[in-house]
Amino acid sequence: MRTLLVDTDLTRAVRGALGDGGFAVDVVGTLEQASSAFFSASYEILLLELVLPDGDGLDWLRQLRSDGYSVPAVIMSRLDDLEKRISVFNSGADDFLRKPVSTDELIARMRALLRRSTQITCPIIEFGNLHFDPIGRQVSVDGHPLMIARRELCILEHLLNRAGRIVPRARLEDQLYSFNDEVSGNALEAGIYRLRGYLSRSGATLRIRTVRGIGYTLELTDASSA
């Protein structure tokens, strides 16, 4: 789940905790950078500080809402008086956390927001004998839990969302890695290789097919129709 974090003082540990929780995090420190990032990528959730070097984060969020963007937004700030909190929610924020932030609470609140934002449709993805809960980050094959490492789980999620269709390599890389990450040239291939191992060992009735020069597609195996 790709996240835009607009802040200047959150520690690397917070970003690491979000990564461990299944969030690919892009970190920027100004509203100008936030606008550039927001309009060049697709984000599932925003984390926003109020006081930024080039303006008020609340004004920026207010403009997004007036332009029709409904992506969930969590405000994080040391400013915590009642009037400010009321202003935060009246400006279109979905949640507020006072700094210093507990990463466990932050992740729990983010997942709750994402769960509510997707409740109009069933969040469970089913393909063959595999079930995936994108909010709980849980995978099962024939009802048996399948533990998959975070990066490979992100690959699986994006392939499942477009099952049966070709997912371009560039699109996968864009969704999997934030622009703050240092990514080796064969990182995606290595992740695909490991994910194929997970699926094969679990008896999943689906496979990842390489479309040379383009990307990858997730398809059912012959066993799924036997």
UniProtKB/Swiss-Prot annotation:
Ranges of residues in domain Response regulatory: 1-114
Gene Ontology CC terms: cytosol; protein-DNA complex
Chain coiled-coil ranges: none
Gene Ontology BP annotations: regulation of DNA-templated transcription
SMART domains (UniProt xref): REC, Trans_reg_C
Alphabetized InterPro entries for the sequence: CheY-like_superfamily, OmpR/PhoB-type_DNA-bd, Sig_transdc_resp-reg_receiver, WalR-like, WH-like_DNA-bd_sf
Entry-linked Pfam families: Response_reg (PF00072), Trans_reg_C (PF00486)
Record localization: Cytoplasm
Protein name: Probable transcriptional regulatory protein y4xI
Organism (species): Sinorhizobium fredii (strain NBRC 101917 / NGR234)
